[in-house]
């Protein structure tokens, strides 16, 4: 087995055992990675998980999701060069870690690799695919965020240089990080499905959709040059409206999937 230099953090409250086992198993199938779970103290994960599914369990600091992920990432040893996190109900694609790490191994100027992401419903049925593309890394500064966080990989050195995750954001902290990362190197798009994002009512992203849209708008606007910010409302409100509509459509179609099972 090749040297393990990839670290994946899985934050969880320990309330979705079946999904969590599927998530951890998918990471094992995605490539050679050190898997660290961060969960509230006292959550009896050992009763539902076998030791081969993860490498380390860390206590959640209790300061929010972004703080928990950031804490766990900073706990990785110097041997870990590439990092990311994955929701406890999402999945990595087969061999996706090998696929995502290759461009960064070949070019030290590449600080992040992202690809396509499938949206699946509660039962794992495919709803649609976020195909993304090279354009997404430019679009996210003034339009919808189409850079898929699930399945991506980030160079840890660049993550730390960028200051890690902003603990002030509850939902859109990935967008804030991606924009900051561009100051330290290149973002590379690979045209392959790297992960599956589970769209269901219990998902934080789905349940907190309005707050996520609001945070993303704030992040995009603050990243603009000062002389452009005052004009941001011209395109921000139509964009926010469109994002909400897309979210409602995904919720609708995921509901249709459930009702026909």
Task: Give a label for each model feature.
Residues 4-7, 34, 176:
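Cell-envelope/extracellular polymer assembly enzymes that use nucleotide-activated donors
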Residues 9, 135-215:
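Conserved nucleotide-sugar donor-binding catalytic segment
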Residues 21-25, 70, 93-106, 132, ...:
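Short alpha-helix within the catalytic core of nucleotide-sugar-dependent glycosyltransferases
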Residues 22-34:
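Short, acidic, metal-binding catalytic loop of nucleotide-sugar glycosyltransferases
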Residues 38-47, 87:
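A conserved acidic beta->alpha catalytic loop
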Residues 60-78:
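Glycine-rich, basic loop-to-helix element that forms the pyrophosphate-binding segment
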Residues 79-91:
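Short beta-strand-to-loop acidic/aromatic patch adjacent to the donor-nucleotide binding site
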Residues 91, 95-127:
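Conserved donor NDP-sugar-binding/catalytic core segment of glycosyltransferases
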